[in-house]
Amino acid sequence: MIPVQVGKKIRYSYAKFPEILELPYLIEIQKKSYQWFLDEGLREVFREISPITDFTGNLSLEFLDYYLGKPKYSVEECKERDFTYSAPLRVKVRLLNKETGEIKEQEVFLGDFPLMTEKGTFIFNGAERVVISQMVRSPGVYFSEQVDPNGKKMYLATIIPNRGAWLEFETDVNDHIYVRIDRTRKLPVTVLLKALGYESKGRIAELFDHDDKIIATLERDNTDSREEALIEIYKKLRPGEPPTVESAKTLLDSMFFDPKRYDLGNVGRYKLFKKLNHGVLYRYLEEDGEKEYDKYLNDYVPVKREFIRELTNEDIIYTIRYLLGLMRGQGKVDDIDHLGNRRLRSVGELLQNQFRIGLARMERVVRERMTIQDADSLTPQVLINTRPIVAAIKEFFGSSQLSQFMDQTNPLAELTHKRRLSALGPGGLSRERAGFEVRDVHHSHYGRMCPIETPEGPNIGLIGNLTTYARVNEFGFIETPYRKVDKERGVVTNEIVYLTADEEEKYIIAQANVRLSPEGKFLDEMVNARHGSEILHVEPSKVDFVDVSPKQVFSVATSLIPFLEHDDANRALMGANMQRQAVPLIRTEAPVVGTGIEYKAAKDSGVVVLAKNPGVVERVTADEIVIRNDQGQIDRYKLIKFQRSNQGTCINQKPIVRKGERVEKDQIIADGPSTDHGELALGKNVLVAYMPWEGYNYEDAILISEKLVKEDVFTSIHIEEYECDARDTKLGPEEITRDIPNVGEDALKDLDERGIIRIGAEVRPGDILVGKVTPKGETELTAEERLLRAIFGEKAREVRDTSLRVPHGESGKVVDVKVFSRENGDELSPGVNMLVRVYIAQKRKISVGDKMAGRHGNKGVVARILPEEDMPFLPDGTPVEIVLNPLGVPSRMNIGQILECHLGWAAKALGINVATPIFNGATEEDIFEALRKAGLPEDGKIEVRDGRTGEPFDSRVTVGYVYMLKLAHLVDDKIHARSTGPYSLVTQQPLGGKAQFGGQRFGEMEVWALEAYGAAYTLQEILTIKSDDVVGRVKTYEAIVKGENIPEPGVPESFKVLIKELQSLGLDVKVLTDNDEEVEIKEIDDDIGEKAEEYGLAASIADRDEVKNEYYEEEVEADFEINDDFDGDLED
C-alpha cells in the first residue's frame, strides 16, 4: 500500500501500476467547445453570410467584427429572478451603396447571447441547463456492399455532406455503374461525367484506365454531348419543367459546387481526403506567402489556406475509382458504427448551426428591406431585424432535445450529465429506428465511450458517456491517449500520443497492465495486445503503443466502482447509473474503500469552492471565506446555503479551512453537497452482515437498524418550491392579502400582515402559504346587500379564496420566501403584478419503502427497521447496521461487493481509507493480508449472535463495511391516498396518478379477482359509487356524514356515455326492464347538484388544465425516473 495525499486526507492506494498521465479537466468538452464558438464559430458564420447584396447588386451589407458585452445580471440574480444569463452581442456592420459609393458603418445589437457559467452550464429563464454532445454520422464518403440472392456483390458509395444533396454511386448485377443525385432516379454514371465536362468517351475511359465496367456503362448511356447530359440530369431532378442547358448547368453547379448550398464542412473534406487519398484538401489564398508544416499533407504549405468545403470533380472521379477497386477486390467497405465514422457535435457546433439558421432567416428580411425602402435613408440598423436570431437561440435552449434540464441530484450526476453523448436529437437517430448494431459496444469505443454506463430501457446504447481520458479533436472525433513505444530501444516511453479511432486501426496496442522494468523495457516474452477488433498475444517488439491507464476504457461514474473487475457488466451498469441518483446526506462521509478518483470527480463537478489565488485565510464564517492573497488583495468567496437544486435536493457549502491557514491556488476551501474534505461522498460506510433474517430481506429487501434513523445517518434535506402570482383578471386585479373570506384566525396565525407565511413556520398539508383573493363575477344584489355595500363601501365585494396552500402529502419548514412585485421595479411577465415564491424544506430520515443501493448494482428497498438491540451482533457486542440477503450475490455475479465488504472491514479496523483503482487494485491476497493485519478472521466471516435471544446463528456470517447510498426514489414522494377529489370530464371517473390527486385504478384483472371470489356487492360498489355513479356518490357521502345506511347504487356515467356513443352512430339504443318497459336514464338531477354544493363536493370536476389526460394513462405522474434514462425529451 502506498500512501497518497488526497486534499487534506491520506488514502492508501493498492495501485500496482503508476499513473503516467494526470486525469484531464473533466468538463473540458463543454467549456472548450463553447470557447471555440465565441472565438471562431461566430466569425465563421458571419464570414459565410457576408456580404448580403440586394437583387440588383447595388447595395451590399458586410459584417466586420463582433464582441460580447458584459452580462447584465450575475448567475445568482438570474437564478433568483428567472432571467437568462446572457451578454449582448454587438456587431460592426458596413453598408455599401455601389451607385453613390457611399459607405455607412454602424454597431448593431444582435440580441442577448446565453453565456456558459464557470461550471459548464447555461442559466435559461432561471433554470440551470446543460447542452449535451450529439453523436452523428460524419460527413464524408462511405462504401458499403450488398449481396443479391444469386450471391453477386453489389457496391454502393455515398458522399454525405454536412448540408446539401447526397450523391450516391451504385453498381448493379451486370456491373454497370449508376449515380443517384439527391435520392432521385438513377442515371448511368457517365452521364454525370459528361455533364461535368468530360465529353468524349475516350477521355472518360482514359480516366479509369479503360476499365471494362466503365466501357459497359458507356454503352448503356445514350447521351452524346455535355448539353444532352445536362438536360438528361435536369429531367431527372426537375421532372415536368421545361429543360434548358443553361438552367441545367446552374442547377448542377448550385447543387454541388456552390459553398452556400453545399457544405462538406472541414470534417467532410478531411474524411474524403483520407479515404480517397487524392490530395485535395486546401484552397491556398496566397500561393507565395510564408509557409508552415502541415501534418495532413506531410509538406510545407502556405499559411493562408482554408479547407475546400464544396465538392470537386476529383472527388467524384476518385470515388468511382474506389468503387471500381472494390469490384476488383481492392480497398474495403466502411463500418458505419465505427467511431472513426461518427463524430461529436458539442455545444459550440450545435449553437453555431442554430445561429446560422437565425442569420439565414434574418438575411431574407434584410434583402426584402433593401428592395422596398429608399436607398438613401437606409442604415444597417434599419435593415437588420434581430428577432429571427433571438428566436432561433431561444428555441434551441428552450426546446431542443439536446438542451436538457440539468440533473443536479448530486455532484456526480452533474458531472456525468455534462459529459453525456447522445445519438438522438435533430439530425440523429430516433429510438424506434435504432437497431441492435448502433446500440452495441464496438471495438472502436475502447478508451472513447464507456461500455458500461448507458441507461437501461429504450435508450440503451444510444446514450453514452465519455471515458475518463478521452478528448475531442478539432474535427469532432474522440481521441484517447497512448504511451509511445520506442521500437529501436524496445522501451515504453512517457511520450503521450492521442489517437482517433481511425488512426488506431493501424497499430498494435498493448494493455496498461503489461509488466515493465524501471527503464520501461517489457519483462514478458509475450504480451496481450489489440489490433483493430482483434485481441492478440504478441512479442513485445511488435507493440507500437501502450494504454495509459486501465481507467481509460471507462467513464467517471464507472471508475468510482471499486473491484469493478469482479462485477458482471449488467450490474456494473446499474451501479454506475444508481450512483447518480444518490441523494446528498446531511453529514457526508467519504468511502473507506474508494478508487482514488473521488477527489478529482468532486473538484471538477463545480460544487466545491476552489481558491482562485494562493494566500492566507483571514476570516471564515458559515457563509463566507475571506483570503488575503499573495498580492495583498482580499478575495471573498460567498458560500451557497441551503439552496434548492433542480431535483429538489439541498445544495449547501461549508468551509473546510481554518483562520490563518495557508491555501494554494485551486485548493478546495469549501465542501459542497455530497463531498467530504473535497472527496466525492455519495453515501455512508455501514456495517453489513450477509444473512437472511426472518424473511425480511427476501427478494432484495433490506433490513436496517433503528440507529440509522436515530443518528440521522441516512437523513437528507429536500426543498420544494411553491409559486403564487397575483394577476390582472377581467373582473379586476387579484390581491395578495391576509383578509381571506371564510377562514378562521387559526389558519392565519403564521401569515404576516401582507398575507405571506413567515420564515421558520412549520406547515402541514392544506395550510395557507400565501393568502390571495380573486374577484368573483358581479351578481344581482338584493336590497339588503345594496344597503351593506352603501354603508361599508367596497369591502363587501364578492371575492373568492384562491390562496396557495400546501399540497397533499407535503409538509416541512418554511426556509425562504421571495417576493417580486411590479411596484419594486422587478421585471415580471405580462399581466402579473406580484409573484411570491415559498421554499419548504423537509428532513427526511430513512424509512420503510426507501430505495437503497451499493455501488455494485445491489439495490433494494428497506423492508423493516429493527430496534438496535434486536439486530444481530458481533462477538464484541457491536450490532450490525444493515442485513442484506446473501442470495442476492451468486446469480447476479457482482462479487465486487463481497471484496469491498472484506477490505472495508479491515480498513475500518486499521483506521485508514484505502483506494483500489479499477483493474489495478487490491488482489485477493492483498485483502487476506489486510484482514490479518487488522486481526480479523481471514475468510471475513465471524460468529454472529441473534440480538433477540443472544444465541449464535448456525453458521459464521460474512460481515464488513460497505458503502451504501440512499437513492432519490423516496417513499414520501410516491405514497398517495385519496377519498374524494377531481373527476374526469367525460367519464366522471376519478383521475389517475399522484400528480392529479387521483384514485387507484381498479382494472380488468382486479375485477376478475373479485369475480373469482363472488364478491358481488363489493364489486358493484367499486364500479359505481366509488367511481362514476354521479348521483350515488353524492348520496353515499351524505349517508356517511349523517351516519345512515349506504343507498342503492345508480347508473354509472360511463354507461350513459356508451349509450350516447351508440346513439351517435345512429343506433336506437334503449334500456328496458324485465317487463320490457323503457327506463329513462335521467341526466344529473339539479337537487343532487345542490346537495353536492352543500358537502363541498361541487368543485370536484377537474378543470381542463388540471387534467393532464382525460383518460387515465398508466401513471400520468411526473415521477418517471429522470436519472435512469435522462435524455431530455420527456416523451416518456
Curated annotation (Swiss-Prot):
What's the EC number here?
2.7.7.6
The answer to whether UniProt assigns keyword Glycosyltransferase to this entry is no
Record's keyword annotation contains RNA-binding: no
Q: Which GO terms describe its molecular function?
A: DNA binding; DNA-directed RNA polymerase activity; ribonucleoside binding
Question: Which transformation does this protein catalyse, written as a reaction?
Answer: RNA(n) + a ribonucleoside 5'-triphosphate = RNA(n+1) + diphosphate
Task: Give me the Gene Ontology terms describing cellular component.
Answer: DNA-directed RNA polymerase complex
Record keywords: DNA-directed RNA polymerase, Nucleotidyltransferase, Transcription, Transferase
Return the PROSITE patterns for the record.
RNA_POL_BETA
Q: Which GO terms describe its biological process?
A: DNA-templated transcription
Pfam families membership:
RNA_pol_Rpb2_1 (PF04563), RNA_pol_Rpb2_2 (PF04561), RNA_pol_Rpb2_3 (PF04565), RNA_pol_Rpb2_45 (PF10385), RNA_pol_Rpb2_6 (PF00562), RNA_pol_Rpb2_7 (PF04560)
- State the superkingdom: Bacteria
**Family of this protein:** Belongs to the RNA polymerase beta chain family.
General function of this protein: DNA-dependent RNA polymerase catalyzes the transcription of DNA into RNA using the four ribonucleoside triphosphates as substrates.
How does it associate, per the subunit comment? The RNAP catalytic core consists of 2 alpha, 1 beta, 1 beta' and 1 omega subunit. When a sigma factor is associated with the core the holoenzyme is formed, which can initiate transcription.
The protein's name in its UniProt record: DNA-directed RNA polymerase subunit beta
The encoding gene: rpoB
